[in-house]
Amino acid sequence: KHQDKFSKADKEKLDQYFTSIRELEKRAEQSRNWLDKPKPSTDYVLSDEVDSLDIAQRMKYYYDLMVLALQTDSTRVISLSFSALGPNYGGFTGVSHDYHTLSHHGNVPETMEELLIIEKAYMEGFAYFLDKLKQIKEPSGKTLFDSTMSLFGCGMSSGNSHSNRNLPVVLAGGGFKHGEHKKYERSN
């Protein structure tokens, strides 16, 4: 009966307000339902021997942990930095210096070859992670890969010159068109 006293604009404003409140209540209810939903189980057994693993095995171990965290919805955002994964020289066969030192290669072929060993291992580790995501089916029928965006990159395209121009990155997963290589002009 009080609505008769309001102008049309006031009625629309009130309707908008009450609709917003109802939508917020619905979202809160959905959140409550999510809280009681049991997390998926997994049969993966984590190694007790992490410290004794070589760098390639340690990368796989951390990628396995990341997959499990995403699979069980324990988190939705993960960041992994390789600098903390190995000893000073990276733990790679054929590598005699740490990554940072090698990145300032001075165009010396031997140094660049060592850097390539590390970067190849990093890319193989990322491919391993993506393959694991593709193997896990979700209740929706999609794979975990389809429901995840994974970004792989570095802060510099050339540590030799401290340049971040033409910075190569890989973005993989769901939610966008695949199979493209983008090359942008330097002015961008």
What are these regions, as identified by a protein language model?
Residues 1-188:
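Ligand-binding pockets and gating/stacking loops
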